[in-house]
């Protein structure tokens, strides 16, 4: 489990994160959403120890990530949005670098590469960006870490590859893992991320499971307009509208509509979910 308390970080005089408090529990795939520049990547790098908190604390199973303790380093993996094109075959990379993670499984790496339809014998510096990204995704999953942080993992992937990514993440991660995926392409991950974290500048607007969200908000997909809806958008065949769930009705959460609703009603949403 990761416990974040009053976390703060700034670049010079520009505060990016301020008083961030939340808990990330085991067995969850968290979606980290937010507009560009709100601190999603900064938060990921703080969680994996690449940056040191300037205020507050991060506790990962009783350890501080920035202390870079080997027992924690070998049990976490950070997949950056920018991945290096090494001058070696993908299989060689996995063999050479996998030894730094005690749970690394070469057979799993090759299996995930197969699921992603990627050639492990191809040199990484001859791959397209999408192929390179899939190589690092396969490596990340093969490390079998408890903590996995991914920054925009579907960037550069075509539509079939995005479906393969969803399949791989749901099939090849540990049951006790804590996975945090930063994305601005919510439709790519809509069926696998739960809970949802929405960051704003220096603040957390929402940190809730889909069950909690559907208990408090109702997502309507009919052609009829609803008076007083918090958010409304025309879609083929009608509208998608978000309202307060005053009647306890079940509905399917649209993460994209949720994101827009939260940004249009920041204080209202914080008040609803912080009760």
Regions found by a protein language model. Give the residues of each.
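Conserved ABC transporter NBD signature motif
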Residues: 56-67, 71-72
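The feature captures the beta-strand-to-loop junction immediately N-terminal to the Walker
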Residues: 33-35
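Helix-to-loop junction immediately C-terminal to a conserved catalytic motif
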Residues: 48
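ABC transporter nucleotide-binding domain
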Residues: 165-180, 184-243
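ABC-family P-loop ATPase nucleotide-binding domains
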Residues: 77-135
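Catalytic Walker B motif of ABC-type/P-loop ATPase nucleotide-binding domains
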Residues: 148-152
């Amino acid at each position: 489990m990761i416990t974040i308390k009053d976390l703060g970080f700034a670049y010079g005089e520009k505060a990016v994160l301020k008083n961030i408090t939340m808990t990330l529990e085991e067995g969850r795939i968290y979606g980290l959403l937010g507009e560009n520049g709100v601190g999603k990547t900064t938060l990921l790098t703080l969680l994996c120890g690449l940056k040191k908190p300037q205020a507050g604390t991060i506790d990962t199973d009783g350890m501080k990530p920035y202390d870079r303790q080997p027992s924690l380093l070998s049990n976490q993996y950070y997949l950056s949005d920018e991945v290096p094109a090494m001058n070696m075959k993908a299989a060689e990379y996995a063999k050479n670098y996998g030894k730094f993670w005690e749970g690394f499984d070469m057979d799993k790496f090759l299996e995930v590469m197969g699921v992603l339809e990627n050639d492990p014998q191809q040199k990484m510096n001859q791959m397209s960006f999408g192929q390179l990204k899939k190589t690092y995704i396969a490596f990340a999953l093969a490390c079998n870490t408890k903590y996995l942080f991914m920054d925009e993992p579907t960037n550069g992937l075509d539509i079939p590859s995005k479906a393969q990514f969803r399949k791989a993440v749901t099939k090849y991660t540990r049951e006790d893992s804590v996975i945090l995926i930063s994305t601005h392409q919510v439709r790519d991950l809509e069926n696998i991320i739960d809970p949802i974290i929405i960051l704003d500048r220096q603040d957390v607007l929402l940190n809730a499971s889909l069950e909690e969200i559907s208990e408090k908000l109702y997502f309507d997909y009919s052609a009829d307009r609803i008076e007083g809806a918090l958010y409304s958008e025309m879609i083929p065949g009608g509208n998608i509208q978000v309202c307060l769930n005053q009647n306890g009705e079940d509905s399917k959460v649209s993460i994209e509509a949720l994101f827009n609703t939260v940004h249009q009603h920041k204080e209202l949403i914080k008040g609803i979910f912080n009760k």
